[in-house]
């Protein structure tokens, strides 16, 4: 029987390094280490109650959110996997108030790693897909990293990705040269390329938003969602379906495959806050991926990747997915501002 030829993550990255010359060896190794950490997180997630990792940890993160046991474990896995390899100058996590400098006894590299170790963790105990989101930046030359070193607009990302821990464990990755999806072969322990050059469909009939917050929405979102809900009898003359998983990685992964728009707008409950999702840990990496797949991502007024971060845990409104839909809801926001 002929041996089936499959492209592993390692093979893919080495080929990219040879063909495009835009993937330095240190960055390739860093991505592989992050991918290995995601495999470890996937293992613990899949153990569920058998691994004694479900439930809350009795603590809160810097966002004031109750931490799950798996939140803390996933954060530790990513820190420990990446601190010693010599590829990083520092790390920042949604679960930590301050950035994590590489310990003095380890060599330092030229990259910064930013991550949400376990996105959608409110779904852990009910066995709904959750995931890890990460972003890689260059540390300014010759600098000992400070918080300011991390505060770069999303256009400066050199790589971004997310893992989804669901029926299959998948890793979606961009290094600025398109988007590819790898599926974890649990028997071999390898990430295998299963989707190349992913493209978000331009036309869509699906949208993702938490409709329970409808009474708090601002007029541009009310107008846009109202048109979708009106269906064939409304101005869009087409029926739309709403999908909401409450796990950003799962919602975005569906949109990447089937098209649609993901929305987490600012609302009237907290008018002093520009949104709920974190610019550095969630919005920027997802915006990079979505744009590389032919989609768009804005905060309702401007391109997410152009936003200059002011703090590590800055929040932002998010509209991302199929370009035509993102452009439309963004236009409604801009018209309201006039």
Swiss-Prot record:
What GO cellular component entries does it have? cytosol
- CDD domains, from UniProt? FBPase
Q: Kindly list the cofactors needed.
A: Mg(2+)
Q: Which residues bind substrate?
A: 119-122, 210, 276
Residues where Mg(2+) 2 binds: 116, 119, 282
Binding residue positions for Mg(2+) 1: 94, 116, 118
Could you state a single Gene Ontology molecular function term? fructose 1,6-bisphosphate 1-phosphatase activity
Compartments reported by the entry: Cytoplasm
User: What Pfam families does UniProt report for this protein, alphabetically?
Assistant: FBPase, FBPase_C
Please report the name of this protein according to its UniProt entry. Answer: Fructose-1,6-bisphosphatase class 1
Organism in which the protein naturally occurs:
Paraburkholderia phytofirmans (strain DSM 17436 / LMG 22146 / PsJN) (Burkholderia phytofirmans)
């Amino acid at each position: 029987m002929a041996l089936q030829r499959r492209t592993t993550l390692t093979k893919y990255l080495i080929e990219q390094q040879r063909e495009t010359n835009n993937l330095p060896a240190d960055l390739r190794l860093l991505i592989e280490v992050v991918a290995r950490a995601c495999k470890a997180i996937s293992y613990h997630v899949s153990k569920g109650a058998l691994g004694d990792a479900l439930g809350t940890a009795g603590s809160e993160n810097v966002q004031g959110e109750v931490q799950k046991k798996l939140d803390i474990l996933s954060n530790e896995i990513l820190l420990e996997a990446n601190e010693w390899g010599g590829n990083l100058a520092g790390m920042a996590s949604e679960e930590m108030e301050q950035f994590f400098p590489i310990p003095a006894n380890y060599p330092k590299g030229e990259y910064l790693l930013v991550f949400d170790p376990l996105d959608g963790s409110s779904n852990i105990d009910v066995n709904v897909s959750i995931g890890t989101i990460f972003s890689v930046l260059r540390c300014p030359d010759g600098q000992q990293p400070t918080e300011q070193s991390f505060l770069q607009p999303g256009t400066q990302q050199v790589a971004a990705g997310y893992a989804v821990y669901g029926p299959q464990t998948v890793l979606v990755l961009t290094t600025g040269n398109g988007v590819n999806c790898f599926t974890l072969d649990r028997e071999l322990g390898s990430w295998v390329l299963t989707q190349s050059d992913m493209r978000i469909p331009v036309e869509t009939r699906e949208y993702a938003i938490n409709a329970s917050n409808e009474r708090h929405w601002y007029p541009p979102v009310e107008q846009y969602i109202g048109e979708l809900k009106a269906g064939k009898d409304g101005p869009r003359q087409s029926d739309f379906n709403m999908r909401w998983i409450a796990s950003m990685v799962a919602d975005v992964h569906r949109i990447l495959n089937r098209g649609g728009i993901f929305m987490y707008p600012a609302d009237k409950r907290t008018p002093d806050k520009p949104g709920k999702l974190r610019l550095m840990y969630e919005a920027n990496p997802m915006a990079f991926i979505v744009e590389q797949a032919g989609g768009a991502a804005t905060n309702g007024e401007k391109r997410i990747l152009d936003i200059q971060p002011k703090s590590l845990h800055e929040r932002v409104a998010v509209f991302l997915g199929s370009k035509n839909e993102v452009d439309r809801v963004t236009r409604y926001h801009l018209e309201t501002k006039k």
